[in-house]
Amino acid sequence: MNIEVSIDVEDEVRLALKDYVTVYCRPLPENFLTPCVLVEQMGGTSSNTIDNFVIRLGARAATDAEALQLLRVALGVLEAQTKAQFGKLRYSITNSLASWGSDPVRPDLKLCTATVLVTAHRETIAISES
């Protein structure tokens, strides 16, 4: 039987960004490189063959200015990639952009985050009865 399932949106966003910034999906590795962007899925909705995902991009760098610039680049790349219909991604809207100050994982780093709505097509997979 064929069924429709949601994509791994964190990995799709990582693939869209990886040629332009250092990017990770959750969980952040213990010895992560900086500056970097972490992609986290926070929620979403599904309607027919379309999924709308809420994701958070967290840019970590030595200074607030570097973190904000990295986040702006990541958001610009993601927007360009979704306009180009990269992979399974179809559309993205930045909902909020904020500076959080120090990174809770590594307090020596600064953290800037953005919440983004990403639209993607669901994928069809074949499953067998058990």
PLM feature segments, named:
Residues 40, 58-60:
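Short hydrophobic/aromatic beta-strand micro-patches
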Residues 1-47, 69, 81, 85-86:
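Small/polar-rich, solvent-exposed N-terminal microdomains that initiate assembly or binding
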Residues 1-15, 42-50, 89-130:
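Short, charged interaction patches at domain edges and termini
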Residues 22, 60-64, 110, 116:
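Broad hydrophobic/π-residue packing in well-ordered secondary structure
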Residues 43, 62-79:
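Extracellular/virion structural assembly segments
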Residues 53-55:
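Short amphipathic alpha-helical segments
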